[in-house]
C-alpha cells in the first residue's frame, strides 16, 4: 500500500513539475518578445509585439491559476509525505514568482507603448540590462532541469550573476538620476519612468534567485540551517 501511495505521489510530482516548466518556458518566451520590442524601430511591428505580450500576460495568469489549483488538489487528494509536500509548496511559491516576472514584462511593455513616439535608441541601456536578466532566466530554467550539476553550484552562480548585475544596474541608475536633475519637466517625467523600468528589470533577477533558492531548499534543506 505504501509503495502504491509513493508511486501516486511521484506521478503527481511529475505532472506538477511538467506544468511548472511549461509555465517557465512561457515566461522566457514573453521576455524574449519584450527584448525584441525594446529593439524594434518599426512602429507597426512594435504594435504587434505589444499586443502579443498583452496576450501572453493573460495566458500567464491562467497558467498560474491552473498550477496553483493542481497543486492544492494534489495536496488534498494524495496526503503527501514531508518531501513531496515541500516540493508542492515550492511549486506554488515559485509559480507566484513566475507570475510576477510576467507582470514586469507587461509593465515594461506599457512603458514602451506610452513612449513609442520616441526613437528606439533611447531604450538602448534598458535593452542591455534586460538581455542580462533574460540570460539569467534561461540559466535558471536550465539549472532546475539539470539533474547532473548540484543546485548548490547553480545557487552560487546566480548569486555571482546578481552581484555583477548590481554593478551594471547602479551605473545605469546613477546616470539617469544625474540626468533627472538637469532636464526640463517633461524630460524628467520620462526619466523617472525609465528609472522605474530599470527597477522592474532588477526585480526579475531577484525572483530568479528566489526560485533557485526555493528548489535548493527542497533538495538540501540543511544548507540553510
UniProtKB/Swiss-Prot annotation:
Q: Which domain of life is it from?
A: Bacteria
InterPro entries xref list: P_transport_PhoU, PhoU-like_sf, PhoU_dom
* GO BP terms: intracellular phosphate ion homeostasis; negative regulation of phosphate metabolic process
Pfam families assigned to the protein according to its UniProt record, in alphabetical order: PhoU
PANTHER family with a match to the protein in the record:
PHOSPHATE-SPECIFIC TRANSPORT SYSTEM ACCESSORY PROTEIN PHOU
What is this protein identified as? Answer: Uncharacterized protein MG409 homolog
Amino acid at each position: 500500500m505504501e509503495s502504491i501511495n509513493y508511486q501516486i505521489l511521484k506521478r503527481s510530482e511529475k505532472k506538477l513539475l511538467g506544468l511548472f516548466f511549461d509555465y517557465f518556458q512561457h515566461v522566457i518566451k514573453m521576455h524574449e518578445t519584450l527584448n525584441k520590442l525594446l529593439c524594434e524601430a518599426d512602429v507597426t511591428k512594435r504594435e504587434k509585439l505589444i499586443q502579443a505580450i498583452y496576450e501572453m500576460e493573460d495566458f500567464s495568469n491562467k497558467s498560474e491559476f491552473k498550477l496553483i489549483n493542481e497543486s492544492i488538489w494534489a495536496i488534498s487528494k494524495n496526503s503527501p509525505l514531508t518531501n513531496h509536500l515541500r516540493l508542492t509548496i515550492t511549486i506554488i511559491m515559485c509559480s507566484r514568482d513566475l507570475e510576477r516576472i510576467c507582470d514586469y514584462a507587461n509593465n515594461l511593455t506599457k512603458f514602451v507603448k506610452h513612449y513609442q513616439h520616441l526613437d528606439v535608441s533611447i531604450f538602448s541601456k534598458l535593452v542591455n540590462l534586460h538581455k542580462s536578466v533574460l540570460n539569467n532566466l534561461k540559466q535558471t530554467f536550465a539549472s532546475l532541469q539539470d539533474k547532473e550539476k548540484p543546485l548548490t553550484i547553480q545557487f552560487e552562480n546566480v548569486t555571482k550573476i546578481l552581484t555583477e548585475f548590481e554593478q551594471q544596474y547602479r551605473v545605469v541608475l546613477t546616470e539617469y538620476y544625474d540626468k533627472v536633475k538637469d532636464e526640463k519637466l517633461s524630460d524628467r517625467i520620462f526619466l523617472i519612468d525609465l528609472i522605474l523600468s530599470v527597477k522592474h528589470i532588477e526585480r526579475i533577477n531577484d525572483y530568479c534567485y528566489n526560485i533557485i533558492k526555493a528548489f535548493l531548499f527542497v533538495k538540501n534543506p540543511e544548507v540553510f540551517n
